[in-house]
Amino acid sequence: MAEHGAHFTAASVADDQPSIFEVVAQDSLMTAVRPALQHVVKVLAESNPTHYGFLWRWFDEIFTLLDLLLQQHYLSRTSASFSENFYGLKRIVMGDTHKSQRLASAGLPKQQLWKSIMFLVLLPYLKVKLEKLVSSLREEDEYSIHPPSSRWKRFYRAFLAAYPFVNMAWEGWFLVQQLRYILGKAQHHSPLLRLAGVQLGRLTVQDIQALEHKPAKASMMQQPARSVSEKINSALKKAVGGVALSLSTGLSVGVFFLQFLDWWYSSENQETIKSLTALPTPPPPVHLDYNSDSPLLPKMKTVCPLCRKTRVNDTVLATSGYVFCYRCVFHYVRSHQACPITGYPTEVQHLIKLYSPEN
Protein backbone atom coordinates (compact mmCIF):
# COMPACT_ATOMS: atom_id res chain seq x y z
CA MET A 1 0.00 0.00 0.00
CA ALA A 2 2.90 2.32 -0.65
CA GLU A 3 0.80 4.33 -3.09
CA HIS A 4 -1.53 5.38 -0.27
CA GLY A 5 1.29 6.99 1.69
CA ALA A 6 3.34 8.32 -1.21
CA HIS A 7 1.02 11.20 -1.98
CA PHE A 8 -0.93 11.50 1.28
CA THR A 9 -1.27 15.06 2.53
CA ALA A 10 -2.29 15.71 6.09
CA ALA A 11 -5.50 17.71 6.15
CA SER A 12 -8.32 18.42 8.51
CA VAL A 13 -11.68 16.76 8.12
CA ALA A 14 -13.29 20.03 7.02
CA ASP A 15 -10.62 20.62 4.39
CA ASP A 16 -10.49 17.29 2.55
CA GLN A 17 -10.98 18.76 -0.93
CA PRO A 18 -7.91 18.05 -3.10
CA SER A 19 -6.01 20.85 -4.80
CA ILE A 20 -6.15 21.53 -8.53
CA PHE A 21 -2.62 20.14 -8.88
CA GLU A 22 -3.64 16.78 -7.41
CA VAL A 23 -6.73 16.37 -9.58
CA VAL A 24 -4.96 17.45 -12.77
CA ALA A 25 -2.06 15.08 -12.00
CA GLN A 26 -4.38 12.10 -11.57
CA ASP A 27 -6.23 13.03 -14.76
CA SER A 28 -3.01 13.07 -16.76
CA LEU A 29 -1.79 9.75 -15.34
CA MET A 30 -3.94 7.41 -17.44
CA THR A 31 -3.60 9.79 -20.39
CA ALA A 32 0.16 9.13 -20.31
CA VAL A 33 -0.20 5.37 -19.83
CA ARG A 34 -2.23 4.76 -23.00
CA PRO A 35 0.28 6.12 -25.59
CA ALA A 36 3.15 4.44 -23.74
CA LEU A 37 1.47 1.03 -23.98
CA GLN A 38 0.49 1.75 -27.57
CA HIS A 39 4.12 2.41 -28.46
CA VAL A 40 5.21 -0.86 -26.82
CA VAL A 41 2.56 -2.78 -28.76
CA LYS A 42 3.61 -1.07 -31.99
CA VAL A 43 7.24 -2.11 -31.49
CA LEU A 44 6.18 -5.70 -30.78
CA ALA A 45 3.90 -5.79 -33.83
CA GLU A 46 6.62 -4.44 -36.12
CA SER A 47 9.20 -6.91 -34.78
CA ASN A 48 6.92 -9.95 -35.07
CA PRO A 49 3.68 -9.25 -36.98
CA THR A 50 2.62 -12.91 -36.94
CA HIS A 51 2.45 -13.21 -33.16
CA TYR A 52 1.76 -9.63 -32.06
CA GLY A 53 -0.04 -8.10 -35.03
CA PHE A 54 -3.46 -8.70 -33.48
CA LEU A 55 -2.45 -6.62 -30.45
CA TRP A 56 -1.92 -3.61 -32.71
CA ARG A 57 -5.10 -4.19 -34.72
CA TRP A 58 -7.28 -4.57 -31.63
CA PHE A 59 -5.33 -2.32 -29.26
CA ASP A 60 -8.25 -0.01 -28.44
CA GLU A 61 -10.55 -2.91 -27.54
CA ILE A 62 -7.90 -4.80 -25.53
CA PHE A 63 -6.88 -1.66 -23.65
CA THR A 64 -10.53 -0.84 -22.91
CA LEU A 65 -11.16 -4.35 -21.57
CA LEU A 66 -8.10 -4.23 -19.30
CA ASP A 67 -9.02 -0.71 -18.21
CA LEU A 68 -12.53 -1.93 -17.38
CA LEU A 69 -11.17 -4.71 -15.15
CA LEU A 70 -8.73 -2.32 -13.49
CA GLN A 71 -11.20 0.49 -12.80
CA GLN A 72 -13.94 -1.87 -11.61
CA HIS A 73 -11.47 -3.47 -9.21
CA TYR A 74 -10.44 -0.14 -7.70
CA LEU A 75 -13.88 1.49 -7.67
CA SER A 76 -15.44 -1.48 -5.86
CA ARG A 77 -12.61 -1.84 -3.33
CA THR A 78 -11.16 1.66 -2.81
CA SER A 79 -13.99 3.99 -3.97
CA ALA A 80 -11.57 5.50 -6.49
CA SER A 81 -10.16 4.92 -9.94
CA PHE A 82 -6.61 3.64 -10.32
CA SER A 83 -5.13 7.11 -10.84
CA GLU A 84 -7.20 8.65 -8.03
CA ASN A 85 -6.12 5.93 -5.62
CA PHE A 86 -2.52 6.38 -6.74
CA TYR A 87 -2.64 10.02 -5.61
CA GLY A 88 -4.43 9.28 -2.34
CA LEU A 89 -7.93 10.37 -3.41
CA LYS A 90 -11.37 8.78 -3.19
CA ARG A 91 -14.84 9.31 -4.65
CA ILE A 92 -17.53 10.53 -2.28
CA VAL A 93 -21.21 10.09 -3.15
CA MET A 94 -22.98 13.45 -3.47
CA GLY A 95 -25.82 13.97 -1.03
CA ASP A 96 -24.68 11.11 1.21
CA THR A 97 -25.51 12.12 4.80
CA HIS A 98 -23.14 9.46 6.14
CA LYS A 99 -20.21 10.25 3.87
CA SER A 100 -17.98 11.17 6.82
CA GLN A 101 -18.53 7.69 8.33
CA ARG A 102 -18.33 5.81 5.01
CA LEU A 103 -14.85 4.37 4.46
CA ALA A 104 -13.20 4.08 1.06
CA SER A 105 -12.80 0.32 1.54
CA ALA A 106 -16.60 -0.08 1.31
CA GLY A 107 -16.49 0.77 -2.39
CA LEU A 108 -18.95 2.84 -4.38
CA PRO A 109 -22.67 2.03 -4.57
CA LYS A 110 -23.66 0.24 -7.77
CA GLN A 111 -25.30 3.26 -9.38
CA GLN A 112 -22.29 5.54 -8.91
CA LEU A 113 -19.90 2.68 -9.70
CA TRP A 114 -21.33 1.97 -13.15
CA LYS A 115 -21.70 5.66 -13.95
CA SER A 116 -18.05 6.13 -13.03
CA ILE A 117 -17.02 3.17 -15.19
CA MET A 118 -18.99 4.57 -18.12
CA PHE A 119 -17.21 7.94 -17.92
CA LEU A 120 -13.79 6.45 -17.09
CA VAL A 121 -13.72 3.61 -19.65
CA LEU A 122 -16.48 3.81 -22.25
CA LEU A 123 -16.35 7.55 -22.97
CA PRO A 124 -12.55 7.64 -23.67
CA TYR A 125 -12.96 4.61 -25.97
CA LEU A 126 -15.72 6.33 -27.96
CA LYS A 127 -13.64 9.52 -28.12
CA VAL A 128 -10.64 7.66 -29.54
CA LYS A 129 -12.83 5.94 -32.14
CA LEU A 130 -14.41 9.26 -33.10
CA GLU A 131 -10.99 10.88 -33.57
CA LYS A 132 -9.89 7.99 -35.80
CA LEU A 133 -13.09 8.31 -37.83
CA VAL A 134 -12.51 12.04 -38.29
CA SER A 135 -8.92 11.42 -39.36
CA SER A 136 -10.04 8.78 -41.87
CA LEU A 137 -12.74 11.04 -43.32
CA ARG A 138 -10.27 13.89 -43.67
CA GLU A 139 -7.90 11.65 -45.63
CA GLU A 140 -10.74 10.59 -47.92
CA ASP A 141 -11.73 14.21 -48.43
CA GLU A 142 -8.12 15.26 -49.06
CA TYR A 143 -7.55 12.56 -51.69
CA SER A 144 -11.06 12.96 -53.15
CA ILE A 145 -12.08 9.41 -52.27
CA HIS A 146 -15.79 10.19 -52.02
CA PRO A 147 -18.63 7.70 -51.78
CA PRO A 148 -21.08 7.62 -54.66
CA SER A 149 -23.95 9.14 -52.69
CA SER A 150 -23.84 12.93 -52.85
CA ARG A 151 -26.11 13.18 -49.78
CA TRP A 152 -23.60 11.20 -47.71
CA LYS A 153 -20.82 13.33 -49.12
CA ARG A 154 -22.53 16.52 -47.93
CA PHE A 155 -23.20 14.94 -44.55
CA TYR A 156 -19.66 13.94 -43.73
CA ARG A 157 -18.28 17.24 -45.03
CA ALA A 158 -20.66 19.04 -42.68
CA PHE A 159 -19.52 16.67 -39.92
CA LEU A 160 -15.86 17.49 -40.59
CA ALA A 161 -16.63 21.21 -40.56
CA ALA A 162 -18.57 21.02 -37.29
CA TYR A 163 -16.25 18.66 -35.40
CA PRO A 164 -13.56 21.26 -34.48
CA PHE A 165 -16.20 23.54 -32.96
CA VAL A 166 -17.84 20.70 -31.04
CA ASN A 167 -14.45 19.58 -29.75
CA MET A 168 -13.58 23.16 -28.77
CA ALA A 169 -16.87 23.49 -26.88
CA TRP A 170 -16.18 20.17 -25.11
CA GLU A 171 -12.69 21.20 -24.03
CA GLY A 172 -13.95 24.67 -23.08
CA TRP A 173 -16.58 23.08 -20.84
CA PHE A 174 -13.84 21.28 -18.91
CA LEU A 175 -11.65 24.40 -18.78
CA VAL A 176 -14.46 26.54 -17.34
CA GLN A 177 -15.19 23.88 -14.74
CA GLN A 178 -11.52 23.76 -13.71
CA LEU A 179 -11.41 27.56 -13.39
CA ARG A 180 -14.53 27.48 -11.20
CA TYR A 181 -12.88 24.76 -9.10
CA ILE A 182 -9.74 26.87 -8.67
CA LEU A 183 -11.81 29.89 -7.59
CA GLY A 184 -13.78 27.78 -5.11
CA LYS A 185 -17.06 28.13 -7.02
CA ALA A 186 -17.45 24.41 -7.75
CA GLN A 187 -16.91 21.13 -5.92
CA HIS A 188 -15.89 19.27 -9.09
CA HIS A 189 -12.95 19.95 -11.37
CA SER A 190 -14.59 17.85 -14.09
CA PRO A 191 -18.24 17.92 -15.19
CA LEU A 192 -18.10 14.13 -15.60
CA LEU A 193 -17.77 13.73 -11.84
CA ARG A 194 -20.99 15.68 -11.33
CA LEU A 195 -22.75 13.55 -13.95
CA ALA A 196 -21.54 10.44 -12.10
CA GLY A 197 -22.93 11.81 -8.84
CA VAL A 198 -19.61 11.87 -6.98
CA GLN A 199 -16.93 14.30 -5.86
CA LEU A 200 -13.26 13.82 -5.01
CA GLY A 201 -11.82 13.93 -1.52
CA ARG A 202 -8.59 12.95 0.19
CA LEU A 203 -8.12 9.61 1.86
CA THR A 204 -8.25 9.87 5.64
CA VAL A 205 -6.11 7.94 8.11
CA GLN A 206 -9.09 5.66 8.80
CA ASP A 207 -9.48 4.99 5.06
CA ILE A 208 -5.84 3.98 4.68
CA GLN A 209 -5.95 1.72 7.73
CA ALA A 210 -9.14 0.06 6.46
CA LEU A 211 -7.65 -0.46 2.99
CA GLU A 212 -4.52 -2.04 4.46
CA HIS A 213 -6.49 -4.46 6.66
CA LYS A 214 -9.16 -5.34 4.09
CA PRO A 215 -7.25 -8.17 2.28
CA ALA A 216 -6.47 -9.95 5.55
CA LYS A 217 -10.06 -9.61 6.76
CA ALA A 218 -11.44 -10.89 3.45
CA SER A 219 -9.22 -13.99 3.54
CA MET A 220 -10.29 -14.77 7.12
CA MET A 221 -14.02 -14.37 6.41
CA GLN A 222 -13.96 -16.34 3.16
CA GLN A 223 -15.98 -19.56 3.37
CA PRO A 224 -15.49 -22.60 1.15
CA ALA A 225 -17.92 -22.78 -1.76
CA ARG A 226 -20.40 -25.63 -1.62
CA SER A 227 -22.09 -25.97 -5.01
CA VAL A 228 -20.44 -26.15 -8.42
CA SER A 229 -21.87 -22.79 -9.47
CA GLU A 230 -20.51 -21.15 -6.33
CA LYS A 231 -17.09 -22.67 -7.00
CA ILE A 232 -17.12 -21.40 -10.60
CA ASN A 233 -18.27 -17.97 -9.46
CA SER A 234 -15.56 -17.86 -6.81
CA ALA A 235 -12.90 -18.94 -9.31
CA LEU A 236 -13.99 -16.26 -11.80
CA LYS A 237 -13.88 -13.59 -9.10
CA LYS A 238 -10.40 -14.70 -8.07
CA ALA A 239 -9.22 -14.68 -11.69
CA VAL A 240 -10.61 -11.20 -12.37
CA GLY A 241 -9.18 -9.94 -9.09
CA GLY A 242 -5.79 -11.46 -9.90
CA VAL A 243 -5.73 -9.85 -13.36
CA ALA A 244 -6.72 -6.48 -11.89
CA LEU A 245 -4.10 -6.78 -9.14
CA SER A 246 -1.41 -7.67 -11.68
CA LEU A 247 -2.42 -4.71 -13.85
CA SER A 248 -2.35 -2.33 -10.90
CA THR A 249 1.09 -3.55 -9.78
CA GLY A 250 2.51 -3.32 -13.29
CA LEU A 251 1.00 0.10 -13.86
CA SER A 252 2.31 1.38 -10.53
CA VAL A 253 5.85 0.39 -11.51
CA GLY A 254 5.33 1.69 -15.04
CA VAL A 255 3.99 5.01 -13.80
CA PHE A 256 7.09 5.62 -11.70
CA PHE A 257 9.21 4.75 -14.74
CA LEU A 258 7.20 7.12 -16.97
CA GLN A 259 7.48 9.92 -14.44
CA PHE A 260 11.23 9.35 -14.24
CA LEU A 261 11.54 9.52 -18.05
CA ASP A 262 9.39 12.64 -18.11
CA TRP A 263 11.66 14.23 -15.50
CA TRP A 264 14.83 13.07 -17.28
CA TYR A 265 13.88 14.45 -20.68
CA SER A 266 12.09 17.61 -19.51
CA SER A 267 13.54 20.83 -20.95
CA GLU A 268 13.77 22.39 -17.48
CA ASN A 269 15.95 19.51 -16.33
CA GLN A 270 18.45 19.48 -19.19
CA GLU A 271 20.92 21.75 -17.39
CA THR A 272 20.82 19.51 -14.32
CA ILE A 273 21.38 16.43 -16.46
CA LYS A 274 24.32 18.06 -18.19
CA SER A 275 25.91 18.93 -14.86
CA LEU A 276 25.41 15.37 -13.61
CA THR A 277 26.75 13.68 -16.72
CA ALA A 278 29.46 16.21 -17.62
CA LEU A 279 32.89 14.69 -18.20
CA PRO A 280 36.14 16.35 -17.13
CA THR A 281 37.45 18.93 -19.57
CA PRO A 282 39.86 17.18 -21.96
CA PRO A 283 43.39 18.54 -22.44
CA PRO A 284 43.98 20.93 -25.37
CA PRO A 285 44.73 19.35 -28.78
CA VAL A 286 48.33 18.42 -29.33
CA HIS A 287 48.59 20.32 -32.60
CA LEU A 288 47.92 23.64 -30.81
CA ASP A 289 51.32 23.28 -29.11
CA TYR A 290 53.09 22.95 -32.44
CA ASN A 291 54.89 25.99 -33.72
CA SER A 292 55.49 26.89 -37.31
CA ASP A 293 58.88 25.16 -37.20
CA SER A 294 57.38 21.79 -36.28
CA PRO A 295 58.95 19.02 -38.37
CA LEU A 296 55.50 17.45 -38.85
CA LEU A 297 54.19 20.42 -40.83
CA PRO A 298 55.66 21.59 -44.14
CA LYS A 299 56.60 25.24 -44.49
CA MET A 300 54.62 25.65 -47.70
CA LYS A 301 50.85 25.40 -47.41
CA THR A 302 50.52 23.58 -50.73
CA VAL A 303 52.73 20.68 -49.65
CA CYS A 304 51.32 17.43 -48.29
CA PRO A 305 52.55 16.72 -44.72
CA LEU A 306 52.96 13.01 -45.57
CA CYS A 307 54.75 12.85 -48.91
CA ARG A 308 56.30 16.36 -48.65
CA LYS A 309 55.31 17.07 -52.25
CA THR A 310 52.78 19.38 -53.82
CA ARG A 311 49.36 18.04 -52.97
CA VAL A 312 47.34 16.14 -55.55
CA ASN A 313 43.57 15.67 -55.08
CA ASP A 314 43.35 17.78 -51.94
CA THR A 315 41.58 15.93 -49.14
CA VAL A 316 40.81 17.31 -45.69
CA LEU A 317 40.36 15.28 -42.51
CA ALA A 318 37.09 16.19 -40.79
CA THR A 319 38.56 15.26 -37.40
CA SER A 320 41.53 17.68 -37.50
CA GLY A 321 41.12 20.04 -40.46
CA TYR A 322 44.49 19.27 -42.07
CA VAL A 323 44.76 18.81 -45.85
CA PHE A 324 46.69 15.97 -47.54
CA CYS A 325 46.94 14.18 -50.83
CA TYR A 326 44.04 11.80 -51.20
CA ARG A 327 46.23 8.76 -51.88
CA CYS A 328 48.60 9.52 -48.97
CA VAL A 329 45.97 10.13 -46.32
CA PHE A 330 43.74 7.30 -47.52
CA HIS A 331 46.45 4.65 -47.05
CA TYR A 332 47.60 6.19 -43.75
CA VAL A 333 44.11 6.35 -42.22
CA ARG A 334 43.24 2.86 -43.40
CA SER A 335 46.38 1.50 -41.74
CA HIS A 336 46.52 3.58 -38.53
CA GLN A 337 42.92 4.82 -37.99
CA ALA A 338 44.30 8.17 -36.82
CA CYS A 339 45.21 11.63 -38.08
CA PRO A 340 48.91 11.82 -39.07
CA ILE A 341 49.36 15.19 -37.36
CA THR A 342 47.17 15.18 -34.24
CA GLY A 343 46.70 11.47 -33.65
CA TYR A 344 42.92 11.91 -33.38
CA PRO A 345 40.97 8.69 -34.07
CA THR A 346 39.93 8.85 -37.72
CA GLU A 347 38.11 6.59 -40.16
CA VAL A 348 37.99 6.54 -43.95
CA GLN A 349 34.55 8.18 -43.92
CA HIS A 350 36.13 11.28 -42.36
CA LEU A 351 38.00 12.02 -45.61
CA ILE A 352 36.49 14.96 -47.51
CA LYS A 353 37.79 15.73 -51.01
CA LEU A 354 38.23 19.39 -51.89
CA TYR A 355 37.52 20.82 -55.34
CA SER A 356 39.23 24.19 -55.69
CA PRO A 357 39.06 26.43 -58.80
CA GLU A 358 42.82 25.98 -59.33
CA ASN A 359 42.32 22.25 -59.87
From Swiss-Prot:
The chain crosses the membrane at residues 20-47, 52-76, 110-139, 145-183, 250-277. Pathway: Protein modification; protein ubiquitination. It is found in: Peroxisome membrane. GO terms for cellular component: cytosol; peroxisomal importomer complex; peroxisomal membrane; peroxisome. It holds the Pfam family Pex2_Pex12. A zinc finger (RING-type) spans 304-343. Residues 1-19, 77-109, 184-249 are peroxisomal matrix. It is a multi-pass membrane protein. Its main location: membrane. Residues 48-51, 140-144, 278-359 are cytoplasmic. GO terms for molecular function: protein transmembrane transporter activity; ubiquitin ligase activator activity; ubiquitin-protein transferase activity; zinc ion binding. Signal peptide: none annotated. SUPFAM superfamilies: RING/U-box. Zn(2+) binds at C304, C307, C325, C328. Component of the PEX2-PEX10-PEX12 retrotranslocation channel, composed of PEX2, PEX10 and PEX12. Interacts with PEX19 via its cytoplasmic domain. This is Peroxisome assembly protein 12. It comes from Homo sapiens (Human). The gene is PEX12.
